[in-house]
Design a protein with these regions (language model features):
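Short, well-structured N-terminal submotif of metal-dependent ribonuclease cores
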Residues: 1-44, 57-70, 142
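Acidic, PIN/NYN-like endoribonuclease modules and their adjacent C-terminal/linker elements
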Residues: 1-7, 80, 112-142
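Active-site neighborhoods of divalent-metal-dependent phosphate/nucleic-acid chemistry enzymes
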Residues: 3, 78-117, 121
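A generic structural signal for short hydrophobic patches within well-formed alpha-helices
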Residues: 15-16, 49, 125-126
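Structured helix-beta-strand junction loops
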Residues: 37-39, 74-75, 114, 131
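Active-site-proximal, substrate-binding regions of enzyme catalytic domains
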Residues: 47-83, 88
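Short, hinge-like loop/turn segments at secondary-structure boundaries
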Residues: 59-62, 98, 135-139
């Protein structure tokens, strides 16, 4: 499998870091600019986008969460909603074989399907990268 440096998948960890101006936010900002210019393709599964929403909802309330939903939907990102049998088998294999959340398994499977680098700072993905299942663009040291 060949992973392209012109294709990236956003994990919720990366988007939340960007929204909260945490470590790595500058990298996300640069990637969003490149996607806006059409130099790269940027993807995110709706399951992971839902993770962003519920995280903001839990921490900051529904009004801000709704505003973030509208804001992120305008990012230069291709939002995916694939729930096909083949894709779900890929998701469940990641979840069954690695100590990651179910939502993280969607990000990993999307990365494989799109042959794209996964953008995250979540150390749970280290095992998948170590085993050569995905390639990661780390937004911070893990």
């Amino acid at each position: 499998m060949t992973f392209s440096s012109a294709r990236f998948v956003l994990d919720s960890f990366a988007v939340i870091a960007f929204l909260r101006d945490e470590e790595g936010a500058d990298k996300i900002e640069q990637i969003l600019r490149e996607a806006e210019r059409g130099k790269i393709k940027l993807y995110m599964h709706m399951i992971n986008f839902g993770e962003v929403y519920y995280n903001v909802l839990k921490e900051d309330g529904e009004t801000l969460a709704n505003g973030i939903w509208a804001k992120v939907k305008n990012y230069p990102v291709n939002f995916l909603d694939d729930l096909s049998e083949g894709f779900l088998l890929s998701v469940t294999k990641f979840k069954g074989r690695y100590p990651i959340s179910y939502a993280d398994a969607f990000a990993a499977a999307t990365s494989v399907e799109k042959e794209a680098l996964l953008i995250t700072g979540d150390p749970d993905f280290k095992f998948l990268e170590r085993d050569g299942k995905i390639k990661v663009l780390w937004i911070r040291n893990v």
